[in-house]
């Protein structure tokens, strides 16, 4: 499949899932703490960064229009956009492996569209996760693995591509209002 056909266009309806090894265990951030969900009120923000060895930036978006953007790996000096997480099917306060969540990239300008993702474990290394794309929130079919593609000097995420794993890092701020549900 050509890289241009495999690029992952992120929209409000796209779900991302992480390959599941230990379904139900909590997802942990780079400090070893469980990743907290937005259940309303104040909630923590995170950045998502490549787990590869070397210098890498965090995940961010390249805007195509109001509700469509490509997810890419920002330059190494950029930790990426802050992200909040919410779940439609659970009231658990922490993210669990194998469950699906909305990941809301916090943009410098208001957006009315969210990106929904899901979580699972990549390796036995604590806090390292692999992404896979799902077409709907409650589908029972397997989700294809997400990898990286180098396009015009930028590392974009897409279906297939090079192996790509991530870590969650706490952001320096707490969100003060509820993210879009």
UniProtKB/Swiss-Prot annotation:
GO CC terms: extracellular region
GO molecular function: serine-type endopeptidase inhibitor activity
Residues in the signal sequence: 1-24
Annotated positions for site Reactive bond for trypsin: 68-69
A Pfam family per the record: Kunitz_legume
UniProt keyword Ribosomal protein present: no
Disulfide bonds: 67-113, 134-143, 136-139
UniProt cross-references to SMART domains, sorted A to Z: STI (SM00452)
Family of this protein: Belongs to the protease inhibitor I3 (leguminous Kunitz-type inhibitor) family.
Function: Possesses two reactive sites. Inhibits two molecules of trypsin simultaneously. Inhibits efficiently kallikrein, but chymotrypsin weakly.
Name of the molecule in the record: Proteinase inhibitor B
């Amino acid at each position: 499949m050509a890289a241009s056909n495999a690029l992952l266009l992120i929209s409000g309806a796209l779900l991302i899932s992480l390959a599941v090894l230990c379904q139900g265990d909590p997802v942990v951030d780079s400090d070893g703490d469980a990743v907290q969900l937005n259940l309303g009120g104040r909630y923590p923000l995170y950045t998502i960064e490549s787990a590869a060895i070397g210098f890498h930036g965090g995940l961010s978006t390249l805007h195509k229009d109001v509700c469509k953007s490509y997810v890419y790996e920002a330059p190494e000096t950029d930790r990426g956009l802050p992200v909040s997480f919410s779940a439609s099917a659970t009231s658990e306060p922490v993210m669990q492996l194998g469950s699906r969540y909305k990941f809301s990239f916090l943009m410098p300008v208001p957006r009315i569209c969210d990106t929904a993702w899901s979580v699972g474990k990549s390796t036995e290394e604590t806090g390292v996760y692999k992404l896979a794309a799902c077409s709907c929130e409650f589908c029972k079919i397997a989700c294809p693995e997400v990898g990286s593609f180098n396009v015009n000097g930028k590392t974009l995420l897409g279906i297939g591509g090079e192996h790509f794993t991530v870590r969650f890092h706490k952001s320096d701020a707490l969100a003060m209002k509820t993210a879009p549900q």
